[in-house]
Regions:
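Juxtamembrane intracellular "pre-TM" segments in multi-pass secondary transporters
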Residues: 2-18, 197-244, 430-440
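Substrate-agnostic recognition of the 12-TM MFS/MFS-like secondary transporter fold
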Residues: 19-35, 59-72, 78-90, 110-168, ...
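Small-residue hotspots at the loop-to-helix junctions and early N-terminal turns
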Residues: 34, 41, 46-54, 147, ...
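A single, central transmembrane helix in multi-pass transporters
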Residues: 37, 171-178, 225-291
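Structural signal for membrane-spanning alpha-helices in multi-pass inner-membrane proteins
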Residues: 39, 94-101, 164, 168, ...
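Transmembrane alpha-helix termini and helix-breaking/packing motifs in multi-pass membrane transporters
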Residues: 40-44, 98, 102-103, 159-179, ...
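C-terminal transmembrane bundle of multi-pass solute transporters/carriers
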Residues: 65-69, 76, 80-82, 86-87, ...
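Helix-loop junctions on the cytosolic side of multi-pass membrane transporters
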Residues: 104, 135, 177, 181-211, ...
Length: 441
């Protein structure tokens, strides 16, 4: 079965999940059109990179903060209604930007406000994309569902920038924003009548039932729900340490692509800008192909914890490649391996986190871990920028690779990681509630 048939098949999981994931795909492609259009428009009108950076900083800040502050809404209210609300908010943001572009009026205040609304919508919706999966498919199809999610995300990463660049360069900012608005409208229409069932669990222990019952009978205040997300992550030791590992990955991976790669291509090997695109594309190809084919190739590795360590190893090799001055014609291969490694890390941790967390805490768990991971991006950018200034780009890249390979060894030290990573989907369902009952009270 080819990739297209696989991502559109009805055989392995529910048609509701397929509609939901394809709607997210359209939103992601539309977001790329929006981002490039706004960037091009802002730089053209202001001619100032610093003013444009203010827009980006406010957007990212709104997205990052909305995850822990509003992540509880996905546990308290209907996840599908929350997603629809976020999509409508995204459409309102796109409509504001489109109206401003149509009348040719650029206001940095209004544009920043519209982009912040978009950031809030993305920050709320992103954790739900994972936590809602058990309500849209069967337990036996959870792994397939997360792999398909990764495939569609990878395709969007490859197609989105290309479509956005073509639209902006050929027809201009307004047309790109019209396409974004149209994709959002289609995405909303795909899920507006989509019903979801309760938790997919067929194995409900007394512990899990006692955990979930208070949430339905007693409604805690919003500030308690916010703090409970952090408490759960801190008390479930495996998730606390996995969150630290995720922070360390983002600490080196985000600045690797935003700072190290452009600097290395421009200043060290002195190749044109298209080579940066080639490396990014190679990483995306690794993400795409590994989601479909890598599980079969690595079928001899039976346990998720070993797949997780393999992922850190492949990603570390990618980061080491620049530090070791690998020839430029071989470098894309290492980036493809890095993409494969990132999929192994993300998919296996997401499956365990989503299934093992009791349903009434699932979205807060995902949102809080995502928040910790996002916090590392600006810190890593600052550290890497200073390191390049003092030690050079190759030494800095070498250090990031060594850090990532060290994290591979750190996986083995995470408490109870073998216990949870080696469970079947049926055993994982609500497992954190059984092993850490006090964390969810």
């Amino acid at each position: 079965m080819n990739i297209w048939n696989w991502v559109t098949s009805y055989e392995s999981d529910n048609w509701r999940l397929l509609r939901f994931q394809w709607s997210i795909f359209l939103l992601t492609v539309g977001a790329r059109c929006n981002q490039l259009a706004v960037a091009w428009w802002a730089l053209k009108e202001t001619g100032s990179a610093s003013l444009f950076s203010i827009i980006i900083a406010c957007t990212i800040g709104a997205e990052v903060l909305s995850k822990p502050l509003l992540g509880w809404t996905g546990d308290r209210y209907s996840k599908m209604k929350i997603v629809l609300f976020c999509n409508v908010l995204t459409m309102f943001s796109a409509a504001c930007l489109l109206a401003l572009s149509f009348i040719d009026y650029f206001s940095i205040t209004l544009v920043t406000f519209a982009m912040m609304l978009l950031g809030i919508a993305v920050g709320i919706r992103d954790p739900i994309q994972s936590s809602i999966i058990p309500q849209l498919t069967l337990l036996r199809s959870i792994a397939i569902a997360f792999n398909r999610k990764a495939v569609l995300s990878s395709i969007a990463m490859l197609l989105g920038p290309a479509i956005a660049g073509l639209l902006v360069s050929t027809w201009g900012v307004t047309i790109a924003l019209i396409i974004d608005f149209a994709l959002i409208a289609i995405a909303i229409s795909m899920i507006v009548n989509l019903n979801i069932v309760g938790a997919s669990s067929t194995i409900q222990t007394q512990t899990t039932q006692s955990i979930e019952k208070p949430l339905t009978t007693i409604t805690p205040p919003w500030h308690t729900l916010i703090s409970s997300g952090f408490k759960v992550v801190f008390r479930v030791k495996i998730e606390f340490y996995l969150a630290l590992l995720a922070m360390m990955i983002n600490l080196v991976l985000f600045p690797f692509f935003t700072i190290i790669v452009p600097f290395y291509v421009q200043e060290t090997i002195q190749l044109p800008a298209w080579y940066i695109g080639l490396l990014d594309c190679s990483f995306g190809v690794g993400l795409l192909l590994s989601s479909k084919f890598l599980p079969r190739l690595l079928s001899f590795i039976r346990f998720r914890d070993r797949l997780l360590m393999t992922g850190f190893g492949l990603l570390g090799l990618n980061l080491l490649a620049i530090g070791l001055a690998v020839p430029y014609f071989i470098l894309p291969i290492f980036f493809a391996l890095g993409g494969c490694g990132l999929i192994l890390i993300n998919v296996n941790t997401a499956i365990v986190r989503t299934l093992a967390t009791p349903a009434c805490f699932r979205n807060r768990m995902v949102a809080t871990v995502s928040f910790f991971s996002s916090l590392a991006s600006p810190i890593g950018s600052l550290i890497v920028g200073l390191a390049i200034a003092h030690y050079g780009v190759e030494i800095t890249s070498l250090l990031t690779g060594v850090i990532t390979l060290t994290l591979m060894l750190g996986v083995a030290l995470v408490p109870n990681i073998r216990v949870f990573m080696r469970m079947s989907e049926d055993e994982l369902d609500g497992a954190y509630g059984r092993f850490y009952p006090s964390a969810f009270r």
